[in-house]
Amino acid sequence: MTWTVAVAGATGYAGGEVLRLLTAHPEVEVGALTAASSAGSRLGEHHPHLLSLADRIVQPTEAEILAEHDVVVLALPHGASGAITAALEELASGGRSAPLLIDCGADHRLISQQAWEAYYGSDYAGAWTYGMPELLHHGETRARAQREELAASRRIAVPGCNVTAVTLAVQPGIAAGLLDPSRLTAVLAVGYSGAGKALKPHLTAAEALGSAQPYAVGGTHRHIPEIVQNLEVAGAAAGAARLSFTPVLVPMSRGILATVTAPMTAALREAPDPEAALRAAWDDAYGATGSGESLIQLLPEGSWPITGTVLGSGTATVQVAIDRGAEAVVAMCAIDNLGKGTASAAVQSLNLALGLEETTAITIQGVAP
C-alpha cells in the first residue's frame, strides 16, 4: 500500500528536510506542498536541492487541501498548528476520513496547559502522543511503551530539537536512579537553522560568523517544560526536576551538541564501581555500539559526540562519564537539529503509526567531513 503525504510549511527548513526524506520513502507518495506566504511559487525557488520536487507548485495551507491525504505533516511556526489541526478535526467530524497528523511544531507537545500558557502565551491546543520512540518510561531499561503508544496513534507531536538532545543525553541515568534531577545544568551549542528561515538581523553572516551568541538565558527557553515533562516520564518525581538551560548559537548551519551535568545520587556514589554502574545504565537503554537502538549510538568509552559525524543523519551519538572532582555526571549528545531533532523524528513516528519498519527512509550515516 502507498500512503499519500501532504506537508504544510513545505518551504521552511523543517518542511524541506521532511520532504528530502519522504522522496526516498518507498511506501509514500508526496502530495500537496503548502505554505501560507509562498503559495503559487515553485518549490525549487525555496529548496533547489529537492530536484524531484522542484517544479511542484506550492499551495495555500488550507484544511480542505490537506484533508485529501492519508498523512499530513505540519512544519509550521509555533502557535500556527493549532488552528489548522482544529479545522482538520472539524472536517473529520463531518464524516470525512481523518488523516494521520504529525506536528513538527510545539503546539501539541505539552501535557500541562499551565506550562504552555506560561512559556508560549497563546491558546492551548491540547497534547498529542509524543513522537520520541526512544523515550524511557518509569521502570523501563529499554523504550517500549512509547513505541506502543505511537503505533496506536493518529495524532503525533514531534519533540523539540533541543529537547531531544538533552533527553537522550540523561534519561538513562534518571530512569536508573543514578542522577539527581533537582540540579541539572544543560549548555547547548546550536546551529543557526534551529532559529528558522525567516530573516533576522542577528542571523546575518556579518553578525553570526566568528561569533557565539547565547539566547533565552535565565530559564526562559520554551523547551524547558518539555524536557522536564520527559524526565518525569522517565522516572523523576513530579515537580522534582530542576533544569538550568542555556543554548548558544554557534557558526554552523545544522547541529546541536548538548552537555548536561547532574549530581550523582547516593546509589551511584556508593556503588562498588560507579563508572561501571553508570555505563551499564546507558548500555541497557541504548545498547552497545552497533546494537540496541538503531538511531542512538552509545560511543566507546573515551570518545565524545561531535556534531560533524551526525550531520545530515537521523542518528544521535551519546556519551557519559563521571566528574570525580565535582561528584557529578557529565552526559553529552550530538544530533542534527533538522534530522534527529525534527524531520527524522517525524518520519520515524510516521513509520510506527503506519506499521512500517521504524527506520524506513531515515539516513543513518552522516555526511561529514
Predicted regions and their residues:
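Glycine-rich phosphate/pyrophosphate-binding beta-alpha loops
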Residues: 249-251, 335-341
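Conserved short hydrophobic interaction patches
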Residues: 21, 25, 91, 230, ...
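C-terminal substrate-binding/catalytic lobe of Rossmann-fold NAD(P)-dependent oxidoreductases
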Residues: 27-66, 75, 188, 192-331
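C-terminal lid/capping helical subdomain adjacent to the catalytic/cofactor pocket in oxidative enzymes
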Residues: 330, 334-337, 347-369
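Predominant activation on well-ordered alpha-helical scaffold segments within soluble catalytic domains
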Residues: 19, 167-171, 224-228, 279, ...
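N-terminal Rossmann-like NAD(P) cofactor-binding subdomain of oxidoreductases
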Residues: 1-217, 321-324, 359, 365-369
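Secondary-structure boundary/capping motif
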Residues: 165-166, 270, 341-342
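Active-site catalytic microenvironments for nucleophilic, acid-base chemistry
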Residues: 172-176, 263, 349-356
